[in-house]
Amino acid sequence: MAREQLNGASYNWNAFPDRPQLAVALAGRVADRLTRAIAERGTAVLAVSGGTTPTKFFAALSAMPIAWDKVIVTLVDERFVPASSPRSNAGLVAANLLQNAAKAARFVPLYHEASGIEDAAASDDAALRSLPWPLDVVVLGMGPDGHTASFFPDADDLAELLDPASDRIILPVHAASAGEPRLTLTLARIIDAGFIALHIEGEDKRTAFDGAVAPGPRKPIRAVLDAAPRPVEVFWAP
């Protein structure tokens, strides 16, 4: 059921009794959207998030019988660390999503060696313009502070990251709370996606989400809900 919030923000709340059931349901929805995109334009582009939350979802999605050789997988955001780092989202995706049938997908990472994160972001921005836009599916996560992608509340240039009219695809992120510098898709590119899911688990994340959509200071996840032209699909399990 869509739950309309202030300032036009809307979302569909999809609750599940446990995390394995959520993973299977979300994988099915994503697979359906990717299959539809392949039928319509011959390819599909999926952007996923890192962290520990999506591992069961990745495993379920990796076994879905879709034309993975026609799927491009990229990241919503990435730490400025090599894939060999245990904190790398690329490494997480390689180990958990790009397995089974999904081994046939093409993966486009965000991290590469560069003189600095600003140069890496500029290079990524240019390279990603060759992908077929808009994205077909984006799967977001959310931190307890209400951040999503690398839109940290204390990020330098947060207004630029959250500009729905931005023509940038990737921007660098510097935020004290983030640890390493980050690379992230901009809000403008996320909200263009045909299907946007927010995957959260646990009572703490539900509390954080409810706080983000309540009246008061706007958290970054609320910026996505406000700007997206269609309801965001929220998937939650305790």
From Swiss-Prot:
<dbReference type="InterPro" id="IPR037171">
    <property type="entry name" value="NagB/RpiA_transferase-like"/>
</dbReference>
<keyword id="KW-0378">Hydrolase</keyword>
<comment type="similarity">
    <text>Belongs to the glucosamine/galactosamine-6-phosphate isomerase family. 6-phosphogluconolactonase subfamily.</text>
</comment>
<dbReference type="GO" id="GO:0005975">
    <property type="term" value="P:carbohydrate metabolic process"/>
</dbReference>
<dbReference type="InterPro" id="IPR039104">
    <property type="entry name" value="PGLS"/>
</dbReference>
<dbReference type="GO" id="GO:0017057">
    <property type="term" value="F:6-phosphogluconolactonase activity"/>
</dbReference>
<dbReference type="InterPro" id="IPR005900">
    <property type="entry name" value="6-phosphogluconolactonase_DevB"/>
</dbReference>
<dbReference type="Pfam" id="PF01182">
    <property type="entry name" value="Glucosamine_iso"/>
</dbReference>
<comment type="function">
    <text>Hydrolysis of 6-phosphogluconolactone to 6-phosphogluconate.</text>
</comment>
<protein>
    <recommendedName>
        <fullName>6-phosphogluconolactonase</fullName>
        <ecNumber>3.1.1.31</ecNumber>
    </recommendedName>
</protein>
<comment type="pathway">
    <text>Carbohydrate degradation; pentose phosphate pathway; D-ribulose 5-phosphate from D-glucose 6-phosphate (oxidative stage): step 2/3.</text>
</comment>
<dbReference type="GO" id="GO:0006098">
    <property type="term" value="P:pentose-phosphate shunt"/>
</dbReference>
<dbReference type="InterPro" id="IPR006148">
    <property type="entry name" value="Glc/Gal-6P_isomerase"/>
</dbReference>
